[in-house]
């Protein structure tokens, strides 16, 4: 049943999140992998509920084709938010079930997500994809992994008058500041034997551990604060938040 009345909205504000594995909620079977949407509740007021629909490996195309956007459409209501964060899998040319062309089908798909939110009097927010850990040496990042998709998302935001959080640019700055070695702690990059349920070595430069998820979630929170208005109202006082791994 779709919730839309003012009375029900006063009880709980909902943030729906359509995205991929960088945002997905994980469990003990995939620990220490942690998604941004999994930890984002740490940054929002208790009257806001994060409804995380992010799923590993999905692009805008496969997310819709599998009925995942439809599932959001059946629940989202007036005053809710829809965070839209894709790019990692849209760029996979070798997979026709996921690939989208940045300045045509990708933009068209983003506009479909936006329409779903607006048709239900909800608030869409576009979030550029998280940068991969793509160092050339200790201090220098390589060419951005998602540059065309970032540019396409920015064009879509401007065309449709939708707020945008540029996580891509902010995460690149964070990676440059941290450097190659120090940034490993944010990603699934660790030696053999560090985790009991993941005993093998991992050099995954895309997926996150807890510290990384929290760090990049905080960047999204910062972006929402800069947008202001209802987007900032959902946030706790960021200056008072101190989070350590559970």
Give residue ranges: language-model regions.
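Solvent-exposed, flexible loop/coil residues
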Residues: 27, 40, 67, 212, ...
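Residue-level detector of conserved catalytic or cofactor/ligand-binding positions
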Residues: 239-246
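Serine-esterase "nucleophile elbow" of acetyl-processing enzymes
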Residues: 1-55, 70-81
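Residue-level preference for alpha-helix termini and adjacent loops
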Residues: 22, 62, 205-207
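Alpha-helical cap/lid subdomain in secreted, periplasmic
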Residues: 67-214, 218-236
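Acidic/histidine-rich helix-loop elements
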Residues: 26-32, 54-63, 93-101
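Short, solvent-exposed polar/charged micro-motifs at secondary-structure junctions
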Residues: 60-64, 175-178, 244
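Gly/Ser/Thr-rich beta-alpha loop segments that engage phosphate groups in nucleotides
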Residues: 21, 59, 89
């Amino acid at each position: 049943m779709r919730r839309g009345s003012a009375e029900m909205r006063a009880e709980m504000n909902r943030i729906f999140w359509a995205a991929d594995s960088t945002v997905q909620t994980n469990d003990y079977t995939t620990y220490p992998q942690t998604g941004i949407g999994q930890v984002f509740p740490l940054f929002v007021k208790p009257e806001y509920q994060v409804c995380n629909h992010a799923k590993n490996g999905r692009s805008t195309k496969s997310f819709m084709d599998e009925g995942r956007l439809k599932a959001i459409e059946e629940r989202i209501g007036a005053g809710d938010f829809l965070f839209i964060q894709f790019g990692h899998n849209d760029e996979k040319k070798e997979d026709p079930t996921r690939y989208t062309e940045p300045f045509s089908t990708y933009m068209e798909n983003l506009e479909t997500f936006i329409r779903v939110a607006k048709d239900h009097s909800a608030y869409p927010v576009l979030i550029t994809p998280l940068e991969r850990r793509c160092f050339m040496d200790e201090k220098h990042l390589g060419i951005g992994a998602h540059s065309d998709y970032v540019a396409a998302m920015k064009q879509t935001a401007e065309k449709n008058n939708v707020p945008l959080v540029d996580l891509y640019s902010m995460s690149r700055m964070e990676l440059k500041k941290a450097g190659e070695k120090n940034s490993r702690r944010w990603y699934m990059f660790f030696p053999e034997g560090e985790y009991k349920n993941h005993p093998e070595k991992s050099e995954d430069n895309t997926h996150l551990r807890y510290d990384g998820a929290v760090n990049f979630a905080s960047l999204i929170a910062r972006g929402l604060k800069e947008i202001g208005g209802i987007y900032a109202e959902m946030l706790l006082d960021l200056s008072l938040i101190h989070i350590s791994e559970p």
